Amino acid sequence: VVMNRKNLTAAVLAGLAGAAGIVGSAQAVNINPDGLGQVLIYPYYTVNGGNTTVLSVVNTTDYAKAVKVRFKEGKNSREVLDFNLYLSPYDVWTASIRNVDGTPTMKTADNSCTVPYIYGNDNDGNQAFLPWAMNDTGVADEYGPISRATEGYFEMIEMGVVTDDTEGSATSATHVDGMMDTCDNLVAAWSDPDDLDPDDNGYWYDDFLVDIDAPMGGLFGGAAVVNVQAGTMYTYDAKAINGFAESENPNFVPLHQPPGTSAPSLA
């Protein structure tokens, strides 16, 4: 399958405008030619043919940010990996996608906070793509092996600015001398250790909006498809979209959502 990256970006942008009911509005979502935005669309990744895809996202602001990271396979745009990324001010997060024994797998050696904490897991920063969303649709031609996910696209959505208003979340998300030792605080914020005891719930488990302000934009990203054996590298900048979430809009819906869910959505 050869994915048309320009058509994909145009289709997503049209869908955003239509869903928001702002077609023709001066405040409509728009692609920022400067590459900075609230939403980043990376139109293509592949691990086929010996290729590896490397990627990065940059927080160009002096605020900590909560970002939804979502990978979708190329056949029917089913989710294959979804997690939350918490960026320090002026942070850069990097990762790669490669083929590991037939399974597309993301690897990161970056200690920026994610929930779940992929860098700090017991698998050397590796996270295999998952087939669950491809197996529960009830539509026969949408079933298939994880090899469907060897190419696709991914998106990053700013869910909000992280603050220290009550729980010190921004401090937990911030590097100190290049190191992170507080990501467990953010993982715990989303956790429910004991279903029978509501008093031990994490603060985000109970209230998504604790220490979260409206998105402000300022994300920048890019990716490259690299084939070491062939000696090739194809690079691109992510398409940056502004106007996705306007806190002044009376219909504004807060975007900070749990990891592993379909919200917030560009659909």
Question: Which ranges hold each PLM region?
Answer:
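Short strand-edge motifs at loop-to-beta-strand transitions and within beta-strands
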Residues: L40, W93-A95
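Gram-negative bacterial Sec-dependent N-terminal signal peptides
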Residues: V1-Q27
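Short beta-strand and strand-turn-strand segments in soluble, beta-rich domains
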Residues: R70-F83
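Asparagine-centered strand-capping/turn motif at beta-strand->loop junctions
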Residues: V57-Y63, E73
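Beta-strand-rich interaction surfaces with strong enrichment in secreted/lumenal proteins
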Residues: N30, D82-L85
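Long, compositionally biased low-complexity segments
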Residues: L85-L87, S96-A267
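Short beta-strand/loop motifs in extracellular/secreted proteins, especially
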Residues: T53, Y63-V67, P250-N251
